[in-house]
């Protein structure tokens, strides 16, 4: 037997009958398993000790020989070899079949290998193998062709005419004879000749046959081995039988399947010995064939064999197949050593690169390291002693543990791991309790929250693994999201709220307009309660020593607030002083308007100046993200992660000080809500009257009503937001981006608005109450549809999205950066991606980080901005767009010439690091994960364009699947194949609409269904490939009409939506 742990590769192929017999340790002749009284295996049965080895170590069946000293002896009474019982995992048996049987994989698989080799259809094969027809093996003088099928009656006729002069057989025997006659070399020659002359269907078939014939010839397997004469039986330990508590037995399904084969085989042998009538023998042979089929692949043909409770039995193929099969479950999905899992809790005091490990868990995970260290330090005398010390948890163990885990990173993983940020490395610190502590800023990357989520810990053992974890996977290194290059570690919730509150300004704050010499004075004044965080003050600009201030600015007073001074202490020194949430302040310097010349102040001093000035907006979540991105671009990763930690601490500190909470009193109801509702109610009445008088259709009435109520909700929302106090806690939460949005607030204080029915159609009766007032029973009932659909969708979506990701990774995993430059002369023309007026992805974002394909000059000054094959940095991208250029050719993976994968220049920069991409980077997998990861957030619903109107247009996750599978989309759009002018739009028969396009040389008309919305007008010029109706374009048509580049761009745009 091969050594399980020591082999280089595995070859899978056909086994000859001799090979099967050589594996076997004996023939299984009886279907019995074990004796129910003695509980010993039956002799010659499926668990026989003589064939498969002893059930107890070093002991024969009858008990004559016990002990190791008889190793290798064969007992003369029971015939069992004295050896280890482990051999029952590797010794195989066999069954000598009384009639040849076809192997279902080779006959039923797609394409049927047997069918291709014999040039017979799978249908014909099935008729022969399952004893419905005869096949001619040797035609003799009959004038029949070899491989012709004959029915029972036809066979009789020929047999009467030509007795004993021709051979026709039924069942696998006939097929075996035909397979034995095949001369592979001859067949190969004939097929090669056919390839040269054949066309169409015959050519494809010849190619497929050639593949099979060549494979057989190269592998040295004989075609006739696809028919089994001997059936191997896998070792008994792999199909175990165990006794349950009640004296019953639980057994592997394979035993049942083997039992049926043995029973039928024995019966067939007996019938043959008795010389039974042909028809009975035929029936038995067919049943044997079906039993073997069920054993190899149950359910592949006909109804599956079922066990108790109508459950299909698990055959050999099912053991290997699918997610629960041997490959994906046990070989690719092993459980690993040195790992643990626990609930996560937030660790606000941790540094970016740290995580908290519970003491008990750390001790168990690092046990061997601790034991070695204990022995080295001579705290323990030997390993055994060290082990007992650890188990007792002696005091000295903890000191050693702290030493051991220092600088030894661990990996934290949260399932589902949707992208590479689902596993990151941290340096462990020991914590009390039993929960793993997680740094609050990495929660976004893991998509984790602290409502009971669990995470797994893994310990990298080797020095290489530790180095890799530290260099590549440390959380402090993974600040950018690989899918778009934006920071993924932005503060959230409390941290955002704290920083927002800190940078807020108020008109009525205490001692507004006080002027200070330097920041230390400000902090002292704040500590003593002289000024508030929100107080607007002046500070002498020169005292900041800020390198970005101009000489002019240094002579003036900087108008700022106490909170902003505290906030700016966390920003690196050489950065501009951030006084207002604008890109200008971030990228260049603090704007001049924030500096005041003290000589120009009037009688009331700075206070009077502030009274006439507008308040500056506080810093919200988006702006904090911009600060992080800017710091990351200009400083090192270390500086960025240190600043992130300081921002986090600041946020937590001041959100605690602010004590922002939500109470019922914070929800202020709009006084003139009823008036707005009444106005819109009148509008609805008017529409209903028009409908009753037959002036408008049902569809128009429905759409108008929906529009009226949507407008009512928008109006209420607008007025609510206007009337809200800027320091209202709920407003602060939504404005800062910490939690909630305007719509949530409208539902609390204004009205809930329109709801969707289970079908997705919008119910035209709105919910006019808000949560503050309380819903009526009917309103509550209507709103439960949405909630329930939400839950059902989420469950289905997760599985679909995961499956899509899996298929995408499968396809894209070989796309690796293989070379520096493929030298292509083609490029891709890029510009803004827009849908109507809505911007999906602006031009500047599409070119940044890519390589240019052409020289770009400034249209006015004619200076060269960039040359071909140069990287477009953010600065250059800004120059290009500032120059008014709206499109350009860039290097793209679409046009890359690399034989396998892509090249560095066509790919552009690595978004996860912001550096240029290196050869060997698995960019295909990154792309697949970047599409798959947001998949879970996409909506599942088929969006109805206002219910009745228009046809359904798929959106969200199903649309993404449609694109990648190149299916014909639902709600297909009509496109024009010629360039010209829309001449006419009219009704055609069957309630269809006809659009006539007149070109220079020809006129074409297109039919659209009666419900589609036409988006062109009479007299409008259209280009080739332009869309005439709403909907999604079918990619295959578009390819033939508009060409490759247009189709690539269209698919790209659709995915980005």
Swiss-Prot record:
Q: Write out the GO cellular component annotations.
A: DNA-directed RNA polymerase complex
BP term (GO), one: DNA-templated transcription
Keywords (alphabetical) are: DNA-directed RNA polymerase, Magnesium, Metal-binding, Nucleotidyltransferase, Transcription, Transferase, Zinc
Q: Which reaction does it catalyse?
A: RNA(n) + a ribonucleoside 5'-triphosphate = RNA(n+1) + diphosphate
SUPFAM superfamilies in alphabetical order: beta and beta-prime subunits of DNA dependent RNA-polymerase
Query: At which positions is Zn(2+) 1 bound?
Result: 60, 62, 75, 78
Q: What EC number is given for this enzyme?
A: 2.7.7.6
According to the record, cofactor stoichiometry and binding are noted as: Binds 1 Mg(2+) ion per subunit. Binds 2 Zn(2+) ions per subunit.
Which cofactors does this gene product need?
Answer: Mg(2+); Zn(2+)
Any one GO molecular-function label of the UniProt entry? DNA-directed RNA polymerase activity
* Keyword Transferase assigned: yes
Subunit structure, per the record? The RNAP catalytic core consists of 2 alpha, 1 beta, 1 beta' and 1 omega subunit. When a sigma factor is associated with the core the holoenzyme is formed, which can initiate transcription.
**Any idea what job this protein has?**
DNA-dependent RNA polymerase catalyzes the transcription of DNA into RNA using the four ribonucleoside triphosphates as substrates.
Q: Which family does it belong to?
A: Belongs to the RNA polymerase beta' chain family.
Q: What is this protein called?
A: DNA-directed RNA polymerase subunit beta'
Source species of the chain: Staphylococcus aureus
Which gene specifies this protein's sequence? rpoC
């Amino acid at each position: 037997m091969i050594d399980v742990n020591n082999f280089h590769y595995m070859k899978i192929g056909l086994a000859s009958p001799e090979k099967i017999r050589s594996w076997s340790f004996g023939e299984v002749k009886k279907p019995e398993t074990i004796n129910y009284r003695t509980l010993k295996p039956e002799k010659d049965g499926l668990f026989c000790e003589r064939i498969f080895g002893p059930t107890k170590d070093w002991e024969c069946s009858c008990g004559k020989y016990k002990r190791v000293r008889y190793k290798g002896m064969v007992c003369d009474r029971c015939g069992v070899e004295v050896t280890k019982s482990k051999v029952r995992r590797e010794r195989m048996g066999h069954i000598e079949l009384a009639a040849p049987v076809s192997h279902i994989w080779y006959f039923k698989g797609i394409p049927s290998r047997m069918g291709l080799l014999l040039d017979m259809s799978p249908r014909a094969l099935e008729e022969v193998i399952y004893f419905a027809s005869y096949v001619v093996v040797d035609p003799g003088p009959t004038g029949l062709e070899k491989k012709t099928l004959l029915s029972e009656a036809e066979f009789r006729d020929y047999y009467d005419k030509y007795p004993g002069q021709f051979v026709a057989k039924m069942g696998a025997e006939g097929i075996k004879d035909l397979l034995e006659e095949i001369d592979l070399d001859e067949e190969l020659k004939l097929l090669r000749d056919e390839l040269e002359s054949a066309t169409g269907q015959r050519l494809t078939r010849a190619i497929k046959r050639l593949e099979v014939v060549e494979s057989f010839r190269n592998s040295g397997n004989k075609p006739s081995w696809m028919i089994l004469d001997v059936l191997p039986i896998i070792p008994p330990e792999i199909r175990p039988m165990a006794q349950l508590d009640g004296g019953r037995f639980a057994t592997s399904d394979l035993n049942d399947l083997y039992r049926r084969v043995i029973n039928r085989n024995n019966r067939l042998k007996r019938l043959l010995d008795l010389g039974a009538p042909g028809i009975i023998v035929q029936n038995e042979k067919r049943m044997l064939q079906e039993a073997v089929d069920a054993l190899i692949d149950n359910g592949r043909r006909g109804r599956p064999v079922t066990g108790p409770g109508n459950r299909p039995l698990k055959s050999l193929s099912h053991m290997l197949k699918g997610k629960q099969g041997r490959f994906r479950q046990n070989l690719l999905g092993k459980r690993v050593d040195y790992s643990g899992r626990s609930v996560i809790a937030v660790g606000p005091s941790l540094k970016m690169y740290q995580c908290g490990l519970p003491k008990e868990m750390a001790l168990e995970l690092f046990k061997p390291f601790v034991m070695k260290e204990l022995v080295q330090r001579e705290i323990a005398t030997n390993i055994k002693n060290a082990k007992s010390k650890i188990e007792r948890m002696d005091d000295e163990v903890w000191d050693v543990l702290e030493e051991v885990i220092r600088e030894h990173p661990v990996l934290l993983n949260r399932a589902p791991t949707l992208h590479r940020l689902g596993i990151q490395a941290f340096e462990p610190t020991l914590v009390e309790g039993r929960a793993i502590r997680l740094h609050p800023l990495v929660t976004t990357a893991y998509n984790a929250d602290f409502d009971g989520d669990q995470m797994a810990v893994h310990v990298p053992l080797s020095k290489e693994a530790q180095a890799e974890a530290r260099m590549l996977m440390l959380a402090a290194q993974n600040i950018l999201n690989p899918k778009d290059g934006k920071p993924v570690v932005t503060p959230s919730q409390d941290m955002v709220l704290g920083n927002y509150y800190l940078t807020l300004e108020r008109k009525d704050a205490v001692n507004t307009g006080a002027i200070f010499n330097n920041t230390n004075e400000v902090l002292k004044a704040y500590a003593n309660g002289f000024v508030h965080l929100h107080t607007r003050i002046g500070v002498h600009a020169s005292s900041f020593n800020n390198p970005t201030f101009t000489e002019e600015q240094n002579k003036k007073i900087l108008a700022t607030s106490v909170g902003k001074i505290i906030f700016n202490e966390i920003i690196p020194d050489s950065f501009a002083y951030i006084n207002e949430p604008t890109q200008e302040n971030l990228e260049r310097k603090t704007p001049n308007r924030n500096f005041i010349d003290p000589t120009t102040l009037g009688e009331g001093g700075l206070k009077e100046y502030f009274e006439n000035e507008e308040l500056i907006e506080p810093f919200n979540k988006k702006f904090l993200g911009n600060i992080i991105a800017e710091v990351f671009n200009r400083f090192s990763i270390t500086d960025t992660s240190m600043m992130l930690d300081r921002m986090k601490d600041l946020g937590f500190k001041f959100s605690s000080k602010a004590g922002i909470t939500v109470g019922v009193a914070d929800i202020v109801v709009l006084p003139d809500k009823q008036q707005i509702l009444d106005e819109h109610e009148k509008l609805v009445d008017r529409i209903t009257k028009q409908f009753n008088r037959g002036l408008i259709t049902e569809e128009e009435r429905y759409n108008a009503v929906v529009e009226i109520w949507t407008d009512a909700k928008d109006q209420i929302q607008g007025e609510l937001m206007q009337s809200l106090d800027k320091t209202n806690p709920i407003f602060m939460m939504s404005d800062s981006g910490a939690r909630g949005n305007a719509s949530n607030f409208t539902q609390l204080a204004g009205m809930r608005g329109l709801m969707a029915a289970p079908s997705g159609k919008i119910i035209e009766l709105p919910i006019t109450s808000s949560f503050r007032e309380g819903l009526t029973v009917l309103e509550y009932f209507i709103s439960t549809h949405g909630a329930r659909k939400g839950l059902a969708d989420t469950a289905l979506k997760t599985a679909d999205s995961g499956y899509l990701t899996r298929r995408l990774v499968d396809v894209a995993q070989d796309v690796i950066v293989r070379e520096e430059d493929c030298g292509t002369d083609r490029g891709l023309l890029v510009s803004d991606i827009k849908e109507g007026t809505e911007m999906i992805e602006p031009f500047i974002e599409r070119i940044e980080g890519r390589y240019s394909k052409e020289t770009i000059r400034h249209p006015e000054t004619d200076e060269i901005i960039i040359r071909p094959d140069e990287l477009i940095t953010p600065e250059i991208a800004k120059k290009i767009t500032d120059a008014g250029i709206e499109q350009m050719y860039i290097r793209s993976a679409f046009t890359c010439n690399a034989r396998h994968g892509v090249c560095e220049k066509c790919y552009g920069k690595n978004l996860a690091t912001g550096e240029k991409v290196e050869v060997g980077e698995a960019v295909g997998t990154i792309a697949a994960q970047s599409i798959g990861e947001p998949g879970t957030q996409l909506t599942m619903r088929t969006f109805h364009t206002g219910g009745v109107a228009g046809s359904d247009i798929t959106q969200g996750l199903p649309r993404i699947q449609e694109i990648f599978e190149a299916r014909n989309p639902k709600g297909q759009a009509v496109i024009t194949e010629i360039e010209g002018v829309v001449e006419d739009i009219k009704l055609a028969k069957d309630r269809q609409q006809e659009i006539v396009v007149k070109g220079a040389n020809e006129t074409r008309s297109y039919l659209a269904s009666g419900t589609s919305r036409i988006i062109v007008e009479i007299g409008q010029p259209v280009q080739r490939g332009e869309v005439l109706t709403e909907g999604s374009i079918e990619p295959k048509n578009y390819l033939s009409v508009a060409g490759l580049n247009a189709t690539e761009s269209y698919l790209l745009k659709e995915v980005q939506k």
